[in-house]
Design a protein with these regions (language model features):
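N-terminal, membrane-interfacial amphipathic/helix-forming hydrophobic leader that caps
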Residues: 1-93, 97-100, 104-105, 252-340
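Membrane-interface helix/loop boundary segments of multi-pass membrane proteins
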Residues: 164-198, 230-237
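Hydrophobic alpha-helical segments embedded in the membrane of multi-pass proteins
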Residues: 176, 218-231
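Small-polar-interrupted transmembrane alpha-helices in polytopic inner-membrane proteins
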Residues: 119, 189-208, 221-222
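Membrane-embedded alpha-helical segments of multi-pass membrane proteins
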Residues: 71-76, 148-155, 168, 219-223
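Membrane-interface helix caps and helix-loop-helix hairpins in membrane proteins
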Residues: 159-160, 206-215
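Mid-bilayer segments of alpha-helical transmembrane spans in multi-pass integral membrane proteins
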Residues: 112-128, 159, 163
Length: 340
């Protein structure tokens, strides 16, 4: 068997496509982040009248740093997936789960509602058990900015992260892994399920360097990957995963004031709190995603996603076309009648 190219299509095999896309993404994101940081430094220095050096020294503490990272991640993932789709996968960009029909947007709204409700349940359970103490509300962490303006910062960051992480982990990685695993003896649905599990495990691994990460938090983030990927596995679209991801993070960090995978995005928060209770259940410094309550919410998210898909489509089944290669472009073998 040819190790690099598929003899039938001439495309690179799935492992090489995955590797090249990921390397492109890892090169583009820091490059774009540095370019955005330089642009911000120059603009701020010009507006403030300060020299570049003091502004550069203040950059690591700037509340805009998460936004720079979010925008760089968004552009880097979109560009790397588009390039890989165009030149490696040979499939249109929309085939990575972005067929923006009316039903797509309805599924997105469902996902957003579900992510908000799941995190609200985690908060209310902890509040009822006395594991959190509220210390403030409607707090802005941007100097001189009112709350309504400051809260746009985490909203923008979580919109970027929710979109680009789903496009990367589910839209590109899960799809290509499923195609690569669609081998003799493994039916297409089985390949999709295997790819779902493997891509979720890799999603957990990607969070191992986050602050306060533990082996347990890594396992639970992998479970979050299963929850987020479930809607994609059932529909072949990213609408439900993106919706859940955006509001899960926003309500976790900007509404209830929890850490999000160990990170504090800043900007503003509707509520501020002191975290108590057992770390095993709450996730401690990693946030709810690292605790049993968060894991329970993820399991509930899988259940509610299945119920929604059953309601919308009449059945709950793995979307086998995820494991299929792109359809060949139609090229007529002879000119139409009446034309030379």
């Amino acid at each position: 068997m040819e190790p690099f190219f598929d003899g039938g299509t001439g495309r690179l095999r799935a492992p090489w496509r995955l590797l090249l896309q990921y390397l492109t993404y890892k090169i583009l994101v820091p490059l774009l982040a540095n370019l955005l940081a330089v642009a911000w430094v120059l603009a701020f220095a010009r507006e403030s009248g300060l020299s570049g050096a003091p502004v550069v020294r203040s950059l690591p503490d700037s509340p805009l740093l998460p936004l720079i990272g979010g925008v760089a991640g968004l552009v880097g993932v979109v560009l790397s997936v588009w390039l890989a789709g165009r030149f490696l996968d040979r499939r249109p960009f929309v085939d990575f789960g972005l067929h923006l029909s009316g039903g797509w947007w309805l599924d997105l709204l469902f996902g957003m509602a579900l992510g908000a409700l799941l995190m609200t349940a985690v908060f209310l359970i902890q509040l009822g058990l006395g594991w959190i103490t509220l210390t403030g509300s409607f707090e802005s962490f941007l100097p001189g900015a009112p709350f309504w303006l400051a809260v746009l910062l985490p909203a923008a960051v979580f919109l970027c992260v929710g979109f680009y992480e789903e496009l990367l982990s589910r839209g590109y990685q899960l799809r290509n892994a499923a195609e690569g695993l669609n081998l003799p003896g493994v039916n297409p649905r089985g390949a999709v399920v295997l790819a779902w599990v493997l891509s979720s495990a890799f999603f957990g691994y990607l969070h191992t360097s986050n602050p306060n990460a533990t082996p347990l938090s890594t396992a639970f983030v992998a479970l979050a990957g299963l929850m987020l990927g479930f809607g994609y596995v059932l529909t072949g679209e990213l609408s439900i995963p993106i919706g859940i991801h955006v509001t899960w993070n926003f309500f976790q960090g900007a509404v209830f004031g929890f850490p999000v995978s160990g990170l504090r995005i800043g900007g503003a928060t509707f509520l501020s709190l002191d975290q108590g209770g057992p770390d095993l259940w709450t996730g401690g410094g990693f946030g709810p995603e690292g605790g049993l309550l968060g894991a329970g919410a993820m399991a509930a998210g899988i259940l509610f996603t299945a119920l929604w898909v059953r309601l919308r489509r009449g059945e709950v089944t793995v979307h086998a076309p995820i494991a299929e290669g792109p359809k060949p472009a139609y090229r007529p073998s002879h000119p139409p009648e009446g034309r030379q």
